[in-house]
Swiss-Prot record:
PROSITE patterns: BIOTINYL_LIPOYL, LIPOYL. The glycine cleavage system is composed of four proteins: P, T, L and H. The modification N6-lipoyllysine is found at residue 65. Its cofactor is (R)-lipoate. One of its GO terms (biological process) is glycine decarboxylation via glycine cleavage system. Keywords: Lipoyl. This is Glycine cleavage system H protein. The lineage of its organism: Bacteria, Pseudomonadati, Pseudomonadota, Gammaproteobacteria, Alteromonadales. It comes from Pseudoalteromonas atlantica (strain T6c / ATCC BAA-1087). The keyword Nucleus does not apply. GO terms for cellular component: cytosol; glycine cleavage complex. InterPro entries: 2-oxoA_DH_lipoyl-BS (IPR003016), Biotin_lipoyl (IPR000089), GCV_H (IPR002930), GCV_H/Fam206 (IPR033753), GCV_H_sub (IPR017453), Single_hybrid_motif (IPR011053). The keyword Transcription regulation does not apply. It holds the Pfam family GCV_H.
Length: 129
């Protein structure tokens, strides 16, 4: 079973969201998602300053197996991206909840995060796949 930290919220599309306490949220893909994709070879990140809506496909994770869209789990403005992934996309595999984060978003409505799954709900959604 994949590692599913209880302090994060999750989208059914396998993105995780971590509040940073200043109205911004860090987003990445779950350990389960990176296990399905395999070894990352490239990550296409959104543009800083872009305004996105929940459910928009805004990034691409490319692995040796496949390319997979990454969706915005909440709406808002992209305020930062993980530039380390440009040279080291494998961070998504080795540390999906830490150094392998993808982007930061300033939420239009922070309450939108409450509509995402908690760890138990996400684990149940994986088991139903």
């Amino acid at each position: 079973m994949s590692n599913i930290p209880s302090d994060l919220r999750y989208a059914t599309t396998h993105e995780w969201v971590r509040p940073e306490g200043d109205g911004t949220f860090t987003v990445g893909i779950s350990e389960h998602a990176q296990e399905l994709l395999g070894d990352m070879v490239f990550v296409e990140l959104p543009d800083v300053g872009a305004t996105v809506s929940a459910g928009d496909d805004i990034a691409v994770a490319e692995s040796v197996k496949a390319a997979s869209d990454v969706y915005a789990p909440i709406g808002g403005e992209i305020v930062g991206v993980n530039e380390d992934l440009e040279d080291s996309p494998e961070l998504v595999n080795s540390d999906p909840y830490g150094d392998g984060w993808l982007f930061r978003i300033k939420a239009d409505d922070a309450d939108e995060v409450e509509g995402l799954l908690d760890a138990e709900g996400y684990e149940n959604s994986i088991e139903e796949e």
